[in-house]
Amino acid sequence: MPREIREIKDFLVTVRNKDAKEIRIKKVGKNLTKFKVRCGRYLYTLRVADNAKAAKLMQTLPPSIPTVQVDSNKK
């Protein structure tokens, strides 16, 4: 079940949960970046429209959780 998180602080708290398994980063278009964290029950999604904030958030992610960069497939 997907859940959307709107605040960066809430996303960082969710990423540091014990049941967080994987973080997927997906760039959509020029400015939009989606961060998805798979937890035990839900898939949490954060949308960041600013490239500078997205780059800063990538640096603050915990290294203990595997991070996967996903390419957006445009048809």
Curated annotation (Swiss-Prot):
Keywords: Ribonucleoprotein, Ribosomal protein. InterPro entries: Ribosomal_eL38 (IPR002675), Ribosomal_eL38_sf (IPR038464). GO terms for biological process: protein-RNA complex assembly; translation. It comes from the Eukaryota. The keyword Ribosomal protein applies. One of its GO terms (cellular component) is cytosolic large ribosomal subunit. It holds the Pfam family Ribosomal_L38e. The keyword Ribonucleoprotein applies. GO terms for molecular function: structural constituent of ribosome. Belongs to the eukaryotic ribosomal protein eL38 family. This is Large ribosomal subunit protein eL38.
